[in-house]
Amino acid sequence: MNTRKIIGIVIMVLLLLLCAVLAVLRFDAAKASDAAALRESLATPAPTAAPDVTPEPSPTPEPTATPEPTATPEPTPDPDSPAGRAAALGLPEPPDIDINSWEFILANGDNSIAEYAPPELVTLEGQLVDSRIADALAAMAADTRAQGLSVYLSSGYRSYAEQEANFLRVCRNNGVSDGKDSNGFYITMPAGHSEHQTGLCCDITDIYYPTKNRSLENTAMFQYMSAHCQEFGFILRFPDGMEPITGVMYEPFHFRYVGVEAAEYITANNICFETFVSLYRDIGTAENPQES
């Protein structure tokens, strides 16, 4: 082999070795680069994940209270009106009536009706009464009898002269001169002051009694009629316990016509006729209603 060929081979071998060395160096460099990157990645801490934050609940708004509607105040009644007078006594508003109508004529110790005479009288079961109350009185008696009870109309209208004679007789029988008992309450009215002169009342019992007194409250007839008389427009005119107002002793037999509306108000509120009339006008020396 000639020298030139040998030199060519040697050069070729050297070139191959050089290429191999370069390849190894490139591999090592790449490997070192990868290792450095790995070391860097391991040295850099992983980012800490932000903790989940539970949002604070929004406060529930308080419900806004709906204001109560303001009640319109009731107008204050005129203190001198029937409603105002009733309110002063703790009573409900009285009915709207004409207190000067015939059925509200007031006869008592302070109110004289000496000149009064009913416009027309009729006879009912032997007693004279104002014709304007006859139907109501007959209906009340019939209703009571329908309960199996006895009804006796014992005294209706009396004229001035008849009441004068009655007053003297009762005073004589009771040993008095003024018609009053020991408490100062009338047991009989002077002529001109008796309700019997109006023809609007009637003494009613279950049978005839020569003398009428408080024991009659125990009769079944009285107990029924006194509980239902207002349905027919009547009231018990002189109730128990109201003597200081009426001025008359308790009479559980004396029924007076005032009309259904007034009778129901008087009975429901447990007042007497004087108190009722005083809601509409001053009583005492005040003039009485019209005669017809």
Give the label of every model feature segment.
Residues N2-S292:
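Extracytoplasmic cell-surface/polysaccharide-interacting catalytic and binding patches
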